[in-house]
Amino acid sequence: MIHYRKALIAILSFFMAIPHCWGQNGANSPFTRYRFGQLADQGLGVNKAMGGIGIGLRSNLQINVNNPASYTAVDSLSCLFEVGFTMQNANFSDGNTKLNVKNSSFDYLAMQFRLFRGMGMTLGFLPYSNVGYNFSSTEELPPLSDWDDPTSVIRSYSGNGGLHQAFIGVGYEILPKLSIGTNVSYLFGNFNHKVSANFSDANIYPLARTYYAEISDVKFDFGAQYSLPLSKKGLLTLGATYSLGQDLNAINSYISNQKLNGSVVISDSVTHINKAFQLPHTFGIGATYEYDERLTVGADVLLQKFSETRFFGKKGELADRLKCSVGAQYYPDPTSNNFFKQIKYRAGAYYSKPYVKVNGQEAAREFGVGAGLTLPISSKWGWMNQRSIISISGEWVKIDPQIKGVLTENYLRLSVGLTFNERWFIKQKVR
């Protein structure tokens, strides 16, 4: 018997919790001054310690939003709730000076359950991108002539905001071992980038520029998975995903001005740019191999065609983003009630070519390695029946600049995710 009242209460509680997450921003990086900012990790607890893989991954104990076709793996008796947070320690360096910044952020909120036979549904809230920076630099300008004194300029950069997505997705098993799925997301948020220049020469007016955008639109993601038994204990799952590239509905503005004694003397502004922003066409392929439910290995490749998109009405200023990920999981004994044999061990790594260009050149390369484990949480039903878990993972990430003027960034991240496995659909015996 389906507990509709429980489902309704949970869904309402889920949507009531979303507004409290809007203000969370995990960015604190000079690299976010470019374009949409730092693209957020779309993975949940099952993905984070495995290099972010998920396109070919299926799990009935944790939610995998990287491929909506995986929603059909949910247990018919269960409803899953997941929430995750990350603590981050960041180090920035230009070769001469170093800066250390610590912060924390909300990562995700998701709920998954079986809707009908062969069909699973997921509701979720994820960040899409983060903007957060505030720094300045000083430069000495050469004199115009032998009679002039050198002029110094202080350039200040600041920005904040980000984009978020609340989504609903379904997966459907159209044939035995073949599933398809889709996520429909409401993408929303705002961000601004500000830059100013102040000169030591009073004859040069201070300059300030501000870019602002507020985005609100619908986003579509699609996926498919096919599971192929290779032996009695071996299972290969192939996956593919596609995200629709599209124009974004946005309110945007650009303001540039120069001031003298606090009064604007030169100003230029554009209050709305038609079709200013686009999402990229995104293609992903992945595969995982599972042996005896104990060992899982997998790999993903993701390509985002940012080079074909517009940002503030300009095209060709971004690069295609490529991400390659590998990951593995070891599960000592799925049938045991022993606590230590129920711990899952995970590890993974990835390489990414970011979408940002600086002065027409690709700005950086990104590398990451991580590891983690999943611990069962005790309950009155015991380990095997309830299967609520806590996922803990650590990750080291390096953003390595390819051009001068871009900082080297190193991150240490500790992520914690909680998965609550509620038994909603068990028929109770009446004695």
What are these regions (language model features)?
Residues 1-8:
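Bacterial N-terminal signal peptides that target proteins for export
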Residues 8-9, 416:
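Sequence-pattern detector for short linear motifs
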Residues 9-17:
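Bacterial N-terminal signal peptides
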Residues 17-18, 79:
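Hydrophobic alpha-helical membrane context
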Residues 19-23:
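Sec/Tat signal peptide C-region and signal peptidase I cleavage site
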Residues 24-431:
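Subset of outer-membrane beta-barrel
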